[in-house]
Amino acid sequence: MILLVSPKDVAEAYEAIEGGADIIDVKNPPEGSLGANFPWVIKETREATPEGMLVSAAIGDVPYKPGTVTLAALGATVSGADYIKVGLYGTRSYQEALDVMKNVTKAVKAVGENKIVVAAGYADAYRVGGVDPLVIPRVARDAGCDVAMLDTAVKDGKTLFDHMSIELLKEFVEETHKYGMKCALAGSIKIEEIPMLKEINCDIVGVRGAACTKGDRNEGRIQKDLVKEIVKVCKE
């Protein structure tokens, strides 16, 4: 299983790289679950990351404003991100989510056909009025995305598994694979929960808190030794 680690700055990115992460995912935790960082942080992270290692960028827990979101996606793309992650926070339906993701995909793929577009929903969408998480694979497929993802919108100590059963998560993974896409799962995932994701054939696991000191995504800092421990679990 591939490990995606989410640094907030270049110093943390180096720790993630040295720890053996597969994907370096630039985000800005104070701005939310998939908080967007600044273009220059994405650019600096891309420059610091070895050639051949993929860099991802979250572009925010986005509203239903397709034009605004598409511009943000383009900004992340030209700043050097290989993966463009869109948090479908303010989309209330399949149609709204599709509207956002179709336009994002169009903009990103115009820059580079090999760029990877990620449609991210939330396992706890019921808490924020977001689109049903089980709709995300269909949204991703119909919009021409490459990855369907789930995270958690509210970071209050509850994990992905507090909001969706392993059976529902397996259904999400299987539907995503049926459509020929990769599946990514995140959401305050603890290291001891990773084997469950492997069992349901998840392709990519995303972490920040688990790789940070004190397990704190906001106040903690990513440390390479913690990343190494997670890598070991992902690869064994």
From Swiss-Prot:
Belongs to the MfnB family. HAMAP family: MfnB. One of its GO terms (biological process) is methanofuran biosynthetic process. One of its GO terms (molecular function) is carbon-carbon lyase activity. InterPro entries: 4HFCP_synth, 4HFCP_synth_arc, RibuloseP-bd_barrel. It comes from the Archaea. NCBIfam families: PRK02227.1-1, PRK02227.1-3. The active site is at K27, K85. Pathway: Cofactor biosynthesis; methanofuran biosynthesis. It is an enzyme of class 4 (lyase). This is (5-formylfuran-3-yl)methyl phosphate synthase. The keyword Phosphoprotein does not apply. It comes from Methanococcus maripaludis (strain C6 / ATCC BAA-1332). Keywords: Lyase, Schiff base. Catalyzes the formation of 4-(hydroxymethyl)-2-furancarboxaldehyde phosphate (4-HFC-P) from two molecules of glyceraldehyde-3-P (GA-3-P). It catalyses: 2 D-glyceraldehyde 3-phosphate = 4-(hydroxymethyl)-2-furancarboxaldehyde phosphate + phosphate + 2 H2O. Its EC number is 4.2.3.153.
